[in-house]
Amino acid sequence: SLLQFNKMIKFETRKNAIPFYAF
């Protein structure tokens, strides 16, 4: 779902400090 994808983005951003969707 879109909501879960949004949570995944925020989680990845927090974990890696660089948003994985920036690539």
Curated annotation (Swiss-Prot):
Transmembrane feature ranges: none
Source species taxonomy: Eukaryota, Metazoa, Chordata, Craniata, Vertebrata
Organism listed in the record: Crotalus mitchellii mitchellii
Gene Ontology terms: biological process: lipid catabolic process
Record function comment: Snake venom phospholipase A2 (PLA2) that shows presynaptic neurotoxicity. PLA2 catalyzes the calcium-dependent hydrolysis of the 2-acyl groups in 3-sn-phosphoglycerides.
Cell location: Secreted
EC code: 3.1.1.4
Reported cofactor(s): Ca(2+)
Name listed for the protein in its UniProt record: Basic phospholipase A2 CB2
EC class (word): hydrolase
